[in-house]
Amino acid sequence: MDRFSASHRKRRPVEFSEPERRRQFGWLRHNATGLQIVAEDLRSGRLWPNERTRMMNDGTIVSSPDAPGPGLSAAIEVAHLTKFYKTTLAVDDVSFRITRGSTTGLLGGNGAGKTTTIAMIMGLVLPSSGRIEVLGCSMPRQSAEVLGRMNFESPYVDMPMRLTVRQNLTIFGRLYGVENLTERIEKLAADLDLGEFLDRANGKLSAGQKTRVALAKALINQPELLLLDEPTASLDPDTADWIRRHLQTYRRQNGATILLASHNMLEVERLCDRVIIMKRGRIEDDDSPDKIMARYNRATLEEVFLDVARGRLQEGMQ
């Protein structure tokens, strides 16, 4: 018998029509409107009908028993996290715990499950099963209580092109309820060398400038937890190194926790205290970069990554 008791299985599941299911559990874009919808649904109880629920493969929602929460020393804890997209298994029974103040990299190829894992941690994608705790709160049930303490950055998420940098940052700052917002925007502009671009339309910025604006958006609320998806993708080496150094400075000065998904092995080696290697939705290894390279007798994470991709881990360990 699985962990869901017979009494829970006998309960009548909460059922939604297909259009309603798509509305409630559709893949929300990470923008102001999407986050407001999540927060409003969570406050009203519309998003999660019960305190603990599970989505079955056919989309029906059934109750599951409460699980004990972790201590507050963890920034993120996921247990047996699984995600199906119809019949495709995107994330397969993933468990890990990330301590506060650390930088952890999710390393893996396309389709490894990195972005889906981050989206579930944020509460933007509903897990099929498993438990997620973020900053001491159960996700996504308690998302409204924790969203203001975390943020997300990705070069693949565009902000309105016609709005100026200042207008975009103001929208996100108001969404997060940032106090003294004008001063906060000016400080970020100074820290990230954006002063001369504040009143320029986002659509007129270069790729590197847009990345700095995206980072400013991610730091607008001084998050305790920063989630990054390919933060330096398509950037020249100098700009990418500048972004990495600023992230390191922010973590040191604020005691923040960073979780990043990346294909960039050098970036992970330089930024991360710990690496979680994923393949086909499962965790292949989880340790510090140095220990992983030593264990598989490889000089770089890139060599380890290629071994994982080509199924040669056992050969590397011999």
Walk through the language-model features, giving the residues of each.
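Catalytic Walker B motif of ABC-type/P-loop ATPase nucleotide-binding domains
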Residues: L226-E230
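Helical segment within the ABC ATPase nucleotide-binding domain
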Residues: D241-Q253
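Conserved ABC ATPase "signature" region
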Residues: T170, R174-F197
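Conserved catalytic motifs of ABC-family nucleotide-binding domains
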Residues: Q222
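Conserved ABC ATPase signature
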Residues: A201-L205
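ABC ATPase "signature
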Residues: D286-D287
